[in-house]
Structure formats: C-alpha cells, structure tokens
Amino acid sequence: GFLTAEEKSLVNDLWSKVNVDEVGGEALGRLLVVYPWTQRFFQSFGDLSSADAIMGNGKVKAHGKKVLNSFSDGLKHIDDLKGTFAKLSELHCDKLHVDPENFKLLGNVLVCVLAHHFGNEFTPPVQAAYQKVVAGVANALAHKYH
C-alpha cells in the first residue's frame, strides 16, 4: 500500500475521534466559500449567496455528510481506493463532469478542517499521512478520466 503501517495507525487513531456528519458539512461548506467556482455543481442546493448562507445550508450539510461517509469507507479499504471509488468516480466524472482538480481542493479543505478541530493533536506527521490519503482519494476519484 501507499501508506506505512505507522501512517495508517496515525490516520485511523485520529479518524476514530472525527464527527463525520459535522466535519463533512464544514468541509464541503468551506470548499464552496473558499473556491466559489465549485458552487456551479450545487445550483440545486438553494441559497449559496454568502458564507453564512452556505455554512447554514441543510443540503450542503447533508451532501457533506455523504461525502465524508464515503471517505470513511475509503479509509477501511485504503489499499484499494480505485475499487472503492470506481462508482463515485463514474458518477462525478462521466455524469456530472466535475473537474478532478476539485477533489484535490476538497481534500486540502478537509485537512484544514481537521487541523482546526484537532489543534495540537494534528501534528506534522499526522498531516503528512492525511495529505497522502486525500491525494490518493482524489486520484481514485479522477481515475475514470484517464
């Protein structure tokens, strides 16, 4: 696999403390605020007119929760990310035509949110392991483009 045993345990130890529902909504919300061009994929989500509107939007929270539950699932199959995300890759790439660059942006936002939530616990080695994971997931999601 692309993660060492040590990195896997760092990732899993922190993940066991993550409130997936809350962090998912915050990560997706921040993506839409920080990178406003990503909003075009979410036009059916209602009010995205301001940071407050986005962060309080129920549909954004619900989709963020779905996104992070999938990510959680990916962590359980860390050595087969391509297989785990094949269906979602097809949906996002073929049907929704999401630019794969956006998966990288969301991964980086997720890392920021984790750093924000966990503070000192989010040590440089933990961050390094998570950067590898989000890059791996983004890569797996972009797989259908190649």
From Swiss-Prot:
Q: Which InterPro entries match?
A: Globin (IPR000971), Globin-like_sf (IPR009050), Globin/Proto (IPR012292), Hemoglobin_b (IPR002337), Hemoglobin_oxygen_transport (IPR050056)
Asked whether the UniProt record includes NAD among its keywords, one would answer no
* Gene3D superfamilies named among the record's database cross-references: Globins
The chain residues annotated with the modification S-nitrosocysteine are 93
Q: Give tissue specificity per the record.
A: Red blood cells.
GO terms, molecular function: haptoglobin binding; heme binding; hemoglobin alpha binding; metal ion binding; organic acid binding; oxygen binding; oxygen carrier activity; peroxidase activity
Q: What residues bear Phosphoserine in this entry?
A: 44
User: Cross-referenced PROSITE patterns, in alphabetical order?
Assistant: GLOBIN
User: Binding residues for heme b, per the UniProt record?
Assistant: 63, 92
- What Gene Ontology terms for biological process does this UniProt record contain? hydrogen peroxide catabolic process
Q: Which residues form the Globin domain?
A: 2-146
Positions where N6-acetyllysine occurs in the chain: 59, 82, 144
GO cellular component annotations of the record: blood microparticle; haptoglobin-hemoglobin complex; hemoglobin complex
What are the record keywords, sorted?
Answer: Acetylation, Heme, Iron, Metal-binding, Oxygen transport, Phosphoprotein, S-nitrosylation, Transport
Question: What PANTHER family does its record include?
Answer: HEMOGLOBIN FAMILY MEMBER, HEMOGLOBIN SUBUNIT BETA
> Subunit info?
Heterotetramer of two alpha chains and two beta chains.
- What family classification does the UniProt entry report for this protein? Belongs to the globin family.
Function summary? Involved in oxygen transport from the lung to the various peripheral tissues.
Which protein are we looking at?
A: Hemoglobin subunit beta
